[in-house]
Amino acid sequence: REAAGKRNIGSLIENAVNELDSLDKMSRLERPSQYGNTVQERLFNVALELSITWMNRILFMKLLEAQLIKYHKGNTQYEFLNTDKIQSYDDLNSLFFKVLARKLEDRGVTTKEFFDRVPYLNSSLFEPTELEHTTLFVSNLGDSRLLPIYIATLLKDSNGKRRTGKMNPLQYMF
Protein backbone atom coordinates (compact mmCIF):
# COMPACT_ATOMS: atom_id res chain seq x y z
CA ARG A 1 0.00 0.00 0.00
CA GLU A 2 1.25 3.46 -0.85
CA ALA A 3 2.27 5.87 1.90
CA ALA A 4 -0.54 8.01 3.29
CA GLY A 5 0.20 11.04 1.08
CA LYS A 6 0.51 9.03 -2.14
CA ARG A 7 -2.69 6.97 -2.10
CA ASN A 8 -5.15 7.23 -4.97
CA ILE A 9 -8.55 7.73 -3.35
CA GLY A 10 -10.18 6.93 -6.70
CA SER A 11 -8.90 3.34 -6.64
CA LEU A 12 -11.39 0.67 -5.61
CA ILE A 13 -9.25 -0.33 -2.65
CA GLU A 14 -8.70 3.18 -1.27
CA ASN A 15 -12.31 4.15 -1.91
CA ALA A 16 -13.40 1.03 0.00
CA VAL A 17 -10.91 1.69 2.83
CA ASN A 18 -12.30 5.21 3.18
CA GLU A 19 -15.91 4.01 3.32
CA LEU A 20 -15.15 1.11 5.66
CA ASP A 21 -13.43 3.52 8.03
CA SER A 22 -15.91 6.40 7.85
CA LEU A 23 -18.92 4.10 8.30
CA ASP A 24 -17.17 2.13 11.09
CA LYS A 25 -17.87 -1.13 9.28
CA MET A 26 -14.93 -2.95 10.87
CA SER A 27 -16.84 -3.05 14.16
CA ARG A 28 -19.44 -5.27 12.47
CA LEU A 29 -16.97 -8.04 11.66
CA GLU A 30 -17.37 -11.13 13.80
CA ARG A 31 -13.62 -11.88 13.91
CA PRO A 32 -11.75 -8.78 12.75
CA SER A 33 -8.39 -10.28 13.75
CA GLN A 34 -8.60 -12.68 10.78
CA TYR A 35 -7.99 -9.64 8.55
CA GLY A 36 -4.84 -8.43 10.30
CA ASN A 37 -3.30 -7.23 13.53
CA THR A 38 -3.78 -3.47 13.21
CA VAL A 39 -6.78 -1.38 12.23
CA GLN A 40 -4.99 -0.26 9.05
CA GLU A 41 -4.14 -3.87 8.08
CA ARG A 42 -7.73 -4.90 8.64
CA LEU A 43 -9.13 -2.00 6.64
CA PHE A 44 -6.79 -2.75 3.75
CA ASN A 45 -7.36 -6.52 3.76
CA VAL A 46 -11.15 -6.22 3.87
CA ALA A 47 -11.04 -3.59 1.11
CA LEU A 48 -8.76 -5.86 -0.92
CA GLU A 49 -11.10 -8.83 -0.59
CA LEU A 50 -14.10 -6.71 -1.58
CA SER A 51 -12.20 -5.21 -4.53
CA ILE A 52 -11.20 -8.66 -5.77
CA THR A 53 -14.84 -9.78 -5.62
CA TRP A 54 -16.00 -6.72 -7.56
CA MET A 55 -13.22 -7.00 -10.16
CA ASN A 56 -13.92 -10.72 -10.65
CA ARG A 57 -17.54 -9.85 -11.43
CA ILE A 58 -16.52 -7.08 -13.82
CA LEU A 59 -14.02 -9.32 -15.62
CA PHE A 60 -16.63 -12.05 -15.97
CA MET A 61 -19.15 -9.55 -17.33
CA LYS A 62 -16.60 -8.17 -19.81
CA LEU A 63 -15.99 -11.69 -21.12
CA LEU A 64 -19.75 -12.33 -21.27
CA GLU A 65 -20.33 -9.08 -23.14
CA ALA A 66 -17.64 -9.95 -25.70
CA GLN A 67 -19.20 -13.38 -26.25
CA LEU A 68 -22.69 -11.91 -26.66
CA ILE A 69 -21.43 -9.43 -29.25
CA LYS A 70 -19.49 -12.13 -31.09
CA TYR A 71 -22.47 -14.52 -31.06
CA HIS A 72 -24.72 -11.76 -32.42
CA LYS A 73 -22.27 -10.96 -35.24
CA GLY A 74 -20.90 -7.69 -33.84
CA ASN A 75 -24.25 -6.24 -32.80
CA THR A 76 -23.27 -3.48 -30.35
CA GLN A 77 -26.77 -3.44 -28.87
CA TYR A 78 -25.46 -6.26 -26.68
CA GLU A 79 -22.92 -3.97 -25.01
CA PHE A 80 -23.77 -3.31 -21.39
CA LEU A 81 -20.44 -2.46 -19.74
CA ASN A 82 -20.07 1.14 -20.79
CA THR A 83 -20.60 4.55 -19.27
CA ASP A 84 -23.88 5.02 -21.12
CA LYS A 85 -25.39 2.26 -18.98
CA ILE A 86 -23.06 2.25 -15.95
CA GLN A 87 -22.59 5.82 -14.72
CA SER A 88 -22.20 5.16 -11.02
CA TYR A 89 -21.34 2.47 -8.51
CA ASP A 90 -25.09 2.25 -7.82
CA ASP A 91 -25.61 1.27 -11.47
CA LEU A 92 -22.86 -1.33 -11.20
CA ASN A 93 -24.46 -2.73 -8.05
CA SER A 94 -27.79 -2.94 -9.88
CA LEU A 95 -26.15 -4.83 -12.72
CA PHE A 96 -24.64 -7.30 -10.24
CA PHE A 97 -27.78 -7.99 -8.22
CA LYS A 98 -30.86 -6.73 -10.09
CA VAL A 99 -29.87 -7.95 -13.56
CA LEU A 100 -27.42 -10.84 -13.68
CA ALA A 101 -28.79 -12.47 -10.53
CA ARG A 102 -32.44 -12.34 -11.66
CA LYS A 103 -34.42 -13.91 -14.46
CA LEU A 104 -35.76 -11.41 -16.99
CA GLU A 105 -39.33 -11.79 -15.74
CA ASP A 106 -38.19 -11.10 -12.14
CA ARG A 107 -36.42 -7.82 -12.96
CA GLY A 108 -37.95 -4.43 -12.27
CA VAL A 109 -39.48 -2.55 -15.21
CA THR A 110 -36.68 0.02 -15.52
CA THR A 111 -33.96 -2.58 -15.10
CA LYS A 112 -35.66 -4.87 -17.60
CA GLU A 113 -35.84 -2.13 -20.24
CA PHE A 114 -32.31 -0.83 -19.69
CA PHE A 115 -30.62 -4.25 -19.65
CA ASP A 116 -33.04 -6.20 -21.84
CA ARG A 117 -30.27 -8.04 -23.72
CA VAL A 118 -28.31 -9.11 -20.65
CA PRO A 119 -29.00 -12.73 -19.75
CA TYR A 120 -29.72 -14.14 -16.32
CA LEU A 121 -26.75 -15.99 -14.90
CA ASN A 122 -27.43 -18.69 -12.37
CA SER A 123 -24.11 -18.06 -10.67
CA SER A 124 -23.05 -17.53 -7.08
CA LEU A 125 -20.67 -14.86 -8.39
CA PHE A 126 -23.68 -12.53 -8.57
CA GLU A 127 -24.98 -13.22 -5.09
CA PRO A 128 -23.87 -10.88 -2.31
CA THR A 129 -21.00 -12.28 -0.26
CA GLU A 130 -21.11 -12.46 3.52
CA LEU A 131 -18.40 -9.81 3.64
CA GLU A 132 -20.51 -7.47 1.50
CA HIS A 133 -23.53 -8.04 3.76
CA THR A 134 -21.42 -7.21 6.79
CA THR A 135 -19.45 -4.29 5.38
CA LEU A 136 -19.94 -2.63 1.98
CA PHE A 137 -21.55 -3.13 -1.37
CA VAL A 138 -19.96 -1.53 -4.41
CA SER A 139 -22.83 1.00 -4.32
CA ASN A 140 -21.37 2.41 -1.09
CA LEU A 141 -18.30 3.71 -2.91
CA GLY A 142 -17.94 7.41 -3.65
CA ASP A 143 -18.67 8.21 -7.30
CA SER A 144 -16.93 11.59 -7.47
CA ARG A 145 -13.40 10.34 -6.81
CA LEU A 146 -10.95 10.38 -9.71
CA LEU A 147 -8.07 8.11 -10.59
CA PRO A 148 -4.81 9.32 -12.19
CA ILE A 149 -4.34 7.92 -15.67
CA TYR A 150 -1.38 5.54 -15.83
CA ILE A 151 1.59 7.29 -17.45
CA ALA A 152 2.08 4.53 -20.06
CA THR A 153 -1.64 4.13 -20.82
CA LEU A 154 -2.85 3.04 -24.22
CA LEU A 155 -5.96 5.21 -23.85
CA LYS A 156 -6.22 7.98 -26.45
CA ASP A 157 -8.12 11.25 -26.45
CA SER A 158 -10.32 12.43 -29.34
CA ASN A 159 -7.22 13.70 -31.17
CA GLY A 160 -5.49 10.32 -30.96
CA LYS A 161 -3.01 11.49 -28.33
CA ARG A 162 -2.22 9.55 -25.17
CA ARG A 163 -4.61 10.52 -22.37
CA THR A 164 -3.25 12.28 -19.31
CA GLY A 165 -4.73 13.66 -16.12
CA LYS A 166 -7.43 11.94 -14.10
CA MET A 167 -10.68 10.20 -14.88
CA ASN A 168 -13.58 8.48 -13.22
CA PRO A 169 -12.62 4.87 -12.36
CA LEU A 170 -15.73 3.48 -14.08
CA GLN A 171 -14.84 5.32 -17.29
CA TYR A 172 -11.31 3.98 -16.93
CA MET A 173 -12.56 0.38 -16.61
CA PHE A 174 -15.15 0.52 -19.38
Model segments located where?
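Preference for the N-terminal adenyl/adenosyl cofactor-binding alpha/beta module
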Residues: R1-F174
